[in-house]
């Protein structure tokens, strides 16, 4: 007889404390020891693996290194960099971007003065102080904004081809401000040695607590699946079968790299995809239907047309194309 482990029927949400930025989630009952096991892995993934947007570098006219002072500005460059690291963004754009600012004093330069030139992002903490520009001073600054996961130190944030005076910034991509968990005993029938895990998640507002734990759970599941599907006996393939697999893989890889312009689409659908910055079939199928409908001017008619085109290639929305090394 196989022992049936206790599993939570569902994840409970503490509605009394729930906000757009904070959530308390309760998982019970759990077998003894699983509260700490699940709490640790959820905390690590939430803090280190969720995607977000952050400033990755800056360039200030007349400044050539990160330890300089700026004429007419109260703060020096290191202090300005520290303040910019705290600016939080909400973005649906997957590409890096740059925004240029001209600051004329006297003024209090805050995060709200950072404006996307093409609507790529939204600043969440608009009142965040960055610098004080004195009367008569004019400062021109370029901000480089990128997408990533977790945290990336400045020394790894120096792409090739950057202009002289480019200053790399420690990028705090993670949208999670804080995660903590506690484990308590709970009763099932006459037994009191089961566990209840309480997980507190605080975000910066760019993602909801509910979505953050859902995404973290998916990341964990994707990794654990490799172990669940493990077979100690490897299948034996003939040379012809290996060649067939390689040919099929290469065919799919080329298909996913095919440009959207090569599809027989209406002008409206082409324009919708261009505005959404979807350039290839691979980028298209990696989106879910509801994600596409969230883009500006993207309606059900365009979605139906795209589905018909994808069906010609036996493709669908929401596909995982990571193994085809899409770039």
UniProtKB/Swiss-Prot annotation:
SUPFAM superfamilies: C-terminal domain of RNA polymerase alpha subunit, Insert subdomain of RNA polymerase alpha subunit, RBP11-like subunits of RNA polymerase. It comes from the Bacteria. Its EC number is 2.7.7.6. The keyword Cell membrane does not apply. GO terms for molecular function: DNA binding; DNA-directed RNA polymerase activity; protein dimerization activity. GO terms for cellular component: cytoplasm; DNA-directed RNA polymerase complex. InterPro entries: DNA-dir_RNA_pol_insert (IPR011262), DNA-dir_RNA_pol_RpoA/D/Rpb3 (IPR011263), DNA-dir_RpoA (IPR011773), RBP11-like (IPR036603), RNAP_asu_C (IPR011260), RNApol_insert_sf (IPR036643). It catalyses: RNA(n) + a ribonucleoside 5'-triphosphate = RNA(n+1) + diphosphate. Residues 252-327 are annotated as: Alpha C-terminal domain (alpha-CTD). One of its GO terms (biological process) is DNA-templated transcription. Keywords: DNA-directed RNA polymerase, Nucleotidyltransferase, Transcription, Transferase. Residues 1-231 are annotated as: Alpha N-terminal domain (alpha-NTD). Gene3D superfamilies: 5' to 3' exonuclease, C-terminal subdomain, DNA-directed RNA polymerase, insert domain, RNA polymerase, RBP11-like subunit. SMART domains: RPOLD. Belongs to the RNA polymerase alpha chain family. Homodimer. The RNAP catalytic core consists of 2 alpha, 1 beta, 1 beta' and 1 omega subunit. When a sigma factor is associated with the core the holoenzyme is formed, which can initiate transcription. DNA-dependent RNA polymerase catalyzes the transcription of DNA into RNA using the four ribonucleoside triphosphates as substrates. The N-terminal domain is essential for RNAP assembly and basal transcription, whereas the C-terminal domain is involved in interaction with transcriptional regulators and with upstream promoter elements. NCBIfam families: PRK05182.1-2, PRK05182.2-5, rpoA. This is DNA-directed RNA polymerase subunit alpha.
């Amino acid at each position: 007889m196989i022992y049936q482990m206790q599993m939570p029927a569902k994840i409970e949400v503490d509605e009394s404390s729930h906000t757009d930025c904070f959530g308390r989630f309760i998982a019970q009952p759990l077998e003894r020891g699983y509260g700490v096991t699940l709490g640790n892995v959820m905390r690590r993934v939430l803090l280190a693996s969720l995607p977000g947007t952050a400033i990755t570098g800056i360039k200030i006219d007349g400044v050539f290194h990160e330890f300089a002072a700026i004429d007419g500005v109260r703060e020096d460059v290191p202090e300005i960099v520290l303040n910019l690291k705290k600016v939080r963004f909400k973005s649906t754009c997957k590409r890096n971007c740059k925004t240029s600012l001209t600051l004329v004093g006297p003024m209090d330069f805050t995060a709200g003065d950072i404006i996307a030139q093409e609507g790529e992002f939204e600043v969440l903490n608009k009142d965040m102080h960055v610098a004080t520009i004195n009367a008569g001073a004019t400062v021109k600054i370029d901000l480089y904004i990128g997408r990533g996961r977790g945290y990336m130190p400045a020394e790894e944030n120096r792409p090739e081809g950057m202009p002289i005076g480019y200053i790399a910034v420690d990028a705090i991509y993670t949208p999670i401000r804080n995660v903590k968990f506690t484990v308590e005993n709970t009763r099932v029938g006459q037994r009191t040695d089961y566990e209840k895990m309480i997980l507190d998640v605080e975000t910066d507002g760019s993602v909801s607590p509910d979505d953050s734990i859902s995404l973290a759970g998916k990341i964990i599941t994707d990794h654990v699946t490799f172990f669940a599907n493990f077979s100690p006996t490897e299948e034996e393939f003939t040379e012809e079968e290996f060649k067939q697999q390689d040919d099929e893989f290469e065919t799919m890889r080329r298909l996913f790299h095919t440009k959207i312009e090569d599809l027989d689409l209406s002008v409206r659908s082409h324009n919708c995809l261009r505005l959404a910055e979807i350039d290839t079939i691979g980028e298209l199928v990696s989106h879910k239907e509801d994600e596409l409908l969230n883009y500006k001017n993207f309606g059900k008619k365009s979605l139906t047309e795209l589905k018909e085109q994808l069906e010609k290639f036996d493709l669908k929305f929401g596909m995982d194309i990571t193994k085809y090394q899409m770039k």
